[in-house]
């Protein structure tokens, strides 16, 4: 037998017998294809035998050979397809088509072109069969007329073939190594290698085209021998299906017994829906009893040989009973509603046909049922819809509802648009209402802030800006008031407490920059010199400042704490409104002991008594220059800041600046009556002749003008 499989002559004989008769021998063709698929012959030898048979001059033999080749292509396996798609076979077909001597028969030519086209269409996407497509496109370009194309799936060329044999040094089941005594054997079903003990069974493999018993291993034998029981159960289930209502002859998968229950359920639902659609009335539908369904439910039961089928049927029957109960309840409720509506007055009865295009519950249920059936039919065999006339009737009844459904859909869309417009209007109204509430709330906050802010003096602020002098004239009137006994400005100073200004300046963002006067002092001093000549006597101080040639003069000098004109303006702004206001709570602050540098010696005795003695401990360096100024009342004021800037050490000046910054950043700034008289009150006296409303407090420093000039001449 091995020689019969190895030689090609028996195959040639079979091919001759298959192609010799005028009629096609389908059985012999399938036998040859099974022989090729089972690898009983080499695929290349089979291809060459067919090629030699095609060279026969008889057109009938050529047609029979082409049909045999097509059968082998569809059932011979992948290994034979590779040989058919080789250049050796395809070029032979092309040479037959282009034969110049004796022309090819038209029938043979048409069949050959049709087969080439079908093979090329089925082999699309497979690289190992790409030459089929190339040959097909080449013939198209050369002008050969192919028949019309037909939809061919790639599964046409798929066929089961024996697997390729796998080599190994040990048994792939018991892991025993092979030796001279322990020979290796291949399983024809899986292709693995086993020893004699693990592969002693033999079985025919018809699914691979092997009809003779061949060697298989124990695992494949167990799998293949267990199939007949499954096949028997499948046969029983197929008989059960044949006895059912469907009478379907189409082969179904293994899970068909579960799908059969769904088919019966769908069939019952179809019958119920059709009867309801036929028997429906204006007052709704009334479900009628269906005694004919009982035989349909009881017929499959005798044929159920398994418990699973019985359980499935019981579940289906329970679901059907529940469905019937729900439908009866719904019908009773619908009857009650319709009877109640009919017993009402005529206007109420006339309002019922208000919406004639509204779908009834029966129509809605039929539409949903039809959609469900269509979805399930997609997974059924193609001929199922033709065997179910009830589906066609349901389709026709639903098709008549299409205009009604379109009108109902249009009305629903119009209602939707109306509701959207109303929603937009409501959103606009709510937005306007929120805006109105926000405006009211903001106005309430503004009124609340007006009651607590420095509003009464706000009108006086614009009048103060043009009269701001330089920083050098800031403290000199205070010094003159002390030296020359002009106490007219000092009494209101404790009541005003101008040092409450730094917190306000800090709110406006001025304190941080006012603590560093040397950056703006050179520019602000000359800018206010002309005004200072006309108002008071600050020019000598400016000259003294210029003569010092120190970019950072002694901060301990009273005239240099607020040197920049840009920072004096806010001081003036907040100073005058507080002249008329009672500032008594700002006086007793203990912060005055920290930064009043010139209180102990440079001021009258009354303010000194009000302050604690801690001030003298903190500013001893400042008390001495103040004493010198009190003793030298006839000296010019221009020499005072220069003297402090020269004689005070740089460390003391830095300490004084730090103390000034701390006092300006503190929350109090309230207890500086004496320090403020040294800085702000006299400074306001220099400027007040032009802009300040209270003239009494600021016109007094004008008296010592000649004295200052005389003292400058004496210096």
Swiss-Prot record:
GO terms for molecular function: phosphatidylinositol-3-phosphate binding; ubiquitin binding; zinc ion binding. Transmembrane segments: none annotated. Residues 16-147 form the VHS domain. Residues 291-302, 650-662, 697-706 have a biased composition (Low complexity). GO terms for cellular component: endosome membrane; ESCRT-0 complex. Pfam families: FYVE, UIM, VHS, Vps27_GAT-like. It comes from the Eukaryota. It is a peripheral membrane protein. Residues 261-280, 307-326 form the UIM domain. Residues 510-551, 589-609, 627-647, 663-680 have a biased composition (Polar residues). A zinc finger (FYVE-type) spans 165-225. It is found in: Endosome membrane. GO terms for biological process: protein targeting to vacuole; protein transport to vacuole involved in ubiquitin-dependent protein catabolic process via the multivesicular body sorting pathway. Residues 275-310, 335-355, 481-715 are annotated as: Disordered. Its main location: membrane. Keywords: Endosome, Membrane, Metal-binding, Repeat, Zinc, Zinc-finger. Component of the ESCRT-0 complex composed of HSE1 and VPS27. Belongs to the VPS27 family. The FYVE domain is involved in the binding to phosphatidylinositol 3-phosphate (PtdIns(3)P) which is required for the association to endosomal membranes. Component of the ESCRT-0 complex which is the sorting receptor for ubiquitinated cargo proteins at the multivesicular body (MVB) and recruits ESCRT-I to the MVB outer membrane. This is Vacuolar protein sorting-associated protein 27. The gene is vps27.
């Amino acid at each position: 037998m091995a020689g019969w499989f190895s030689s090609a002559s028996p195959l040639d004989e079979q091919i001759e017998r298959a192609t010799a008769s005028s009629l096609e021998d389908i059985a012999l063709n399938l036998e040859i294809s099974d022989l090729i698929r089972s690898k009983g012959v080499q695929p290349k030898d089979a291809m060459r035998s067919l090629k030699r048979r095609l060279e026969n001059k008889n057109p009938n033999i050529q047609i029979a050979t082409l049909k045999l080749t097509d059968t082998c292509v569809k059932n011979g396996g992948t290994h034979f397809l590779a040989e058919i798609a080789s250049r050796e076979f395809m070029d032979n077909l092309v040479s037959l088509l282009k034969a110049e001597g004796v022309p090819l028969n038209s029938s043979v030519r048409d069949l050959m072109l049709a087969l080439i086209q079908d093979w090329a269409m089925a082999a699309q996407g497979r690289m190992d069969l790409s030459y089929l497509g190339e040959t097909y496109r080449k013939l198209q370009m050369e002008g050969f007329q192919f028949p019309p194309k037909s939809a061919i799936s790639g599964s046409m060329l798929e066929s089961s073939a024996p697997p390729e044999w796998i080599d190994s040094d040990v048994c792939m089941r018991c892991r025993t190594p092979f030796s001279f005594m322990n020979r290796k054997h291949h399983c024809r079903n899986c292709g693995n290698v086993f020893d004699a003990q693990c592969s002693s069974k033999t079985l025919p493999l018809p699914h691979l085209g092997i009809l003779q018993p061949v060697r298989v291993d124990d695992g494949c034998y167990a799998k293949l021998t267990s199939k007949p029981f499954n096949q028997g159960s499948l046969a029983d289930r197929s008989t059960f299906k044949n006895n059912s209502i469907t009478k379907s002859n189409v082969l179904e998968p293994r899970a068909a017994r579960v799908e059969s229950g769904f088919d019966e359920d769908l069939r019952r639902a179809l019958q119920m829906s059709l009867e309801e659609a036929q028997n429906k009335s204006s007052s709704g539908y009334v479900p009628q009893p269906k005694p004919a369904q009982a035989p349909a439910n009881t017929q499959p039961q005798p044929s159920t040989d398994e418990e699973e089928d019985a359980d499935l049927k019981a579940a289906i029957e329970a679901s059907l009973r529940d469905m019937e109960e729900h439908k009866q309840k719904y019908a009773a409720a619908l009857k009650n509603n319709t009877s109640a509506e009919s017993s009402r007055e005529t206007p109420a009865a006339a309002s019922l046909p208000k919406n004639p295009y509204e779908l009834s519950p029966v129509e809605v249920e039929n539409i949903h049922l039809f959609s469900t059936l269509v979805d399930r039919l997609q997974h059924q065999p193609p001929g199922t819809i033709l065997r179910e006339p009830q589906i066609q009737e349901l389709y026709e009844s639903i098709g008549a509802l299409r205009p009604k459904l379109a009108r109902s859909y249009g009305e629903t869309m119009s209602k939707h648009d109306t509701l959207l417009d109303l929603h937009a209007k409501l959103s606009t109204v709510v937005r306007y209402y929120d805006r109105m509430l926000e405006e009211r709330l903001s106005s309430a906050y503004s009124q609340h802030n007006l009651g607590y802010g420095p509003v009464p003096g706000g009108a006086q602020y614009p009048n103060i800006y043009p009269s701001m002098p330089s920083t050098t004239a800031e403290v000199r009137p205070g010094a003159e008031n002390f030296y020359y006994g002009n106490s007219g400005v000092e009494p209101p100073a404790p009541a005003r407490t101008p040092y409450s200004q730094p917190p306000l300046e800090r709110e406006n963002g001025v304190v941080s920059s006012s603590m560093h006067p040397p950056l703006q002092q050179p520019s602000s001093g000359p800018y206010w010199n002309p005004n200072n000549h006309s108002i008071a006597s600050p020019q000598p101080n400016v000259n003294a400042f210029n003569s010092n040639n120190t970019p950072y003069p002694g901060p301990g000098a009273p005239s240099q704490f607020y040197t920049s004109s840009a920072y004096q303006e806010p001081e003036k702004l907040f100073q005058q409104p507080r002249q008329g206001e009672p500032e008594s709570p700002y006086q007793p602050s203990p912060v005055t002991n920290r930064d009043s540098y010139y209180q102990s010696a440079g001021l009258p005795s009354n303010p000194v008594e009000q302050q604690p003695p801690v001030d003298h401990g903190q500013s001893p360096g400042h008390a001495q220059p103040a004493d010198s100024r009190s003793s030298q009342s006839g000296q010019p004021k221009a020499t005072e800041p220069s003297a402090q800037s020269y004689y005070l050490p740089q460390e003391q000046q830095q300490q004084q600046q730090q103390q000034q910054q701390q006092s300006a950043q503190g929350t109090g700034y309230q207890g500086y009556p004496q320090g403020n008289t040294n800085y702000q009150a006299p400074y306001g006296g220099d400027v007040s002749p032009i802009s300040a409303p209270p003239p009494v407090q600021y016109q007094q420093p004008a008296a010592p003008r000649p004295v200052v000039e005389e003292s400058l001449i004496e210096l």
